Amino acid sequence: MRTYVEDESDPGLISKKFWKYLKSTSGGTRVPETVNYGSRFRNNPLGQSELFNEFFCDQFSAASTYDIDIDFSNDTDFDIDFNFRKIRKLLKLVNPNKAAGPDEIHGRILKNCAVSLAYPLSVIFRTSYNSGMIPKDWKIANVVPVHKKGSKMSVENYRPISLTSLIMKIFEKIIRDELMWRCENQLFNNQHGFLPNKSCTTQLLSFTDSIATALNASTRTDIVYFDFAKAFDSVNHDIILRKLKERFKIDGTLLKFMVNYLQHREQCVVVAGQKSSSASVRSGVPQGSILGPLLFVLFIDDMSEVVSEGTKIALYADDTKIWRKINVWEDHEILQQDINALHKWSIDNKMKFHPKKCKVVPVSPPDKALQDLFNKIFPLRNIYFYNLGGVQLEFVKEEKDLGVIVTSKLSWEEQVEALLSKASSRLGLLKRTMHFLKCQKQRRAFYLAIVRSQFEHCVQVWRPSSDSVNQKIERIQRRAVKWILSEQDHSYNDLEYLMRLRDLDLLPLKERFITSDLLLFYDIYHNCSCVKLPPYIKPLTADERRRLRPKINRNKNIPDNECLSFHKLRESRNDPMSLKCEIEPKSKAFKSNFFFRTVQEWNCLPSEIKEAATKSNFREKLLEHVKLKVFKTVAMESNDS
């Protein structure tokens, strides 16, 4: 096992072979010995691959005609440069360990032969694009079933991931960049999936800020989560081609190419090396391709047009939610009208929702005694039941939203507890299975990749402000440090712990989270992010900065960073980049909101850090500042000794 883990080139590193093994044993791509589709069961790889292929084909929508008028009169507008230098650069970026597609041309060959292959490929790409004819082998996919959730025995709980030709992926990257350049400015801002500078974090930040602001004003918000049935596989080719032409003004050679890209595709499913028979792909965009995700985003974009003013919508690929402030009873009815409009959109676009999987989360301020009494006397009087296509939607207290648990109180206790449980479990697994490792560098790498990474996803959204919760999270890292240093029997005081963190080049997790907040806030402040500063965050005027007075924290419920101390006061008075929040925080949800808490941290930064010209320069200065602040006590102790 030791030789399997260690990298031959550097024993301090962990071999790629081991990471691949770890991924394969995590269950994402493993198929159990027996799978079923309805009442049919298969227990051999070939039979399983056929069963998976049948299920995936059953999800296709009606076949398309591909009958669309193409206008070549302005075709020079759609000319694409297939420069061999650009292709050579893309070839050199190919991951040599990437799985080969059906053509069995491996990434290592493309990377190592980039100089020789660049020019002939540029000729092939240009000829293929101009003629609107893609080689047949480039439109064949080996499909790998990847488990989503639910029983692993049921093929219905898997999604198809397509392994296509690596050469075709390079071709697609060039086309995708052109398509993105033409369409990006026409997309609604509320789509955050598969787009540059957008992510789960950017989507959830704007969403949670809207909910927290409403809670702070004692206003209820109803959130409706939608679940598409096999969204990527259901995209009708005629509809997406029509939208490309009419909505995004794609025409001529580029549209002709897209028609051929979607036409006559074939797939076979691979399970344990056994291939199913080939099947025609009647609809959908291939998951695992380069163009597929962008085509889906373009297909679903006009969904945003159907909701009412005052109702907000957010998308991450097919993950869709709408929400609305509920001030009066009519707001329920308007939200129901929006649900109806989205249902009609799905029918018109030949997509399907899973009504049983669509949920409603009502986010309300703390109940008042009088309201509680009223609910006991008239339990159904003030409840509006939403429905989707005649099916009543279920009300739930929490819903996992892009990997983050959103609750009816907009509190993050459930999210933190889930992460603590998972991180603790993974750390325990490391201790049991990697006990033979003696190298600190390897142990540290395992901790970062398998344990600490659990706290990285969307941390700017859910970061706890409570010291007690931060201490719970830090205990995980304390245990990890003992394991990394083989000091399980030791008990550290705070100073000893900080000394070990410094030696391992680690930060306390609270400071790491704050650093993540500030790095994102830098982008937002400098308009380098799709997220914008909310209207209640304003610059401090010169007069306001002069009138600043230090605050002494007499309230233990208010974190220290919300109180402006004397040394921070001097910085803020002279700093034109200081900001203020014009909303008085009344709710716990708003106090822990990203924008409110991060403004306090931002104002406390020295002006020379905030004025950094680039993101990399800001990161460098910020980390230096944070480390100096965190390890100041350690440095003083070392000097004394």
Where does each model-flagged region fall?
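Basic/polar low-complexity segments
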Residues: 1-84, 374-387, 525-583
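Short linear motifs embedded in intrinsically disordered, charge-biased segments
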Residues: 38-39, 469-641
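Conserved pre-catalytic core of RNA-dependent polymerases
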Residues: 56, 77-286
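Catalytic palm active-site di-aspartate
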Residues: 101, 140-143, 159, 191-193, ...
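Catalytic palm subdomain of template-directed nucleic-acid polymerases
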Residues: 111, 230-248, 321-344, 464
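Active-site palm subdomain of RNA-directed nucleic acid polymerases
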Residues: 175-191, 216, 293-323
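Short, conserved micro-motifs composed of acidic
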Residues: 337, 352-397
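Basic, alpha-helical interaction scaffolds
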Residues: 390-460
